[in-house]
């Protein structure tokens, strides 16, 4: 199969970064300039946002736990919930109606509207689509054990990203089970499901069910 592009994964109407992402073919290409985009976007926000610290903009109807740590640059959208102990390390664009859960860490990432990483998750150098959801303890690993650049592979093509750190691209409404591990450079298509404890490498097409590393079925 082909490597999934931004247009295959995401409805760009569900993120403030839609116009920005539309400039690129693959999700990873948007990560280098993400911090600069967030800084510029933050300056355009109106009175329904508060700059709670330099370059950290939070919608007034978002709920931020007192123990959450939020570093710049970050934008957090309307009605979004950031729970106790969450660590947002900056370069994070978090949409409306999203959830960043307890003891969850996120950096250099886009969460589309309605995306949820609610319990003990790690999401680095990644993009999570509209209403994508990661179960408790699921992680988007972004660094190879051999410290090499991350490559995206399918049986048809190989994409050299040139990035030392690259997490995952989760398509709209993708569901990731508890304690699943998404290996660096993994891509999960729209409406696909990954079962708990599964390790995902490479590219999973849309509307699939990943039952284990070797068993992928159509989602009916």
Residue ranges and their predicted role:
Residues 54-56, 74, 186, 202:
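Residue "hotspots" at secondary-structure boundaries inside conserved domains
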Residues 17-19, 111-113, 118-220:
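Glycine-rich hexapeptide-repeat left-handed beta-helix
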Residues 92, 104-106, 115-117:
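Periodic small-residue-enriched repeat registers in elongated scaffold domains
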Residues 58-103:
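Glycine-rich active-site/cofactor-binding loop and its immediate structural neighborhood
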Residues 1-55, 60, 191, 197, ...:
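Terminal amphipathic alpha-helical/low-complexity segments used for targeting or macromolecular assembly
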Residues 53, 59, 71, 129, ...:
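Residue-level recognition of the GNAT/N-acetyltransferase active site
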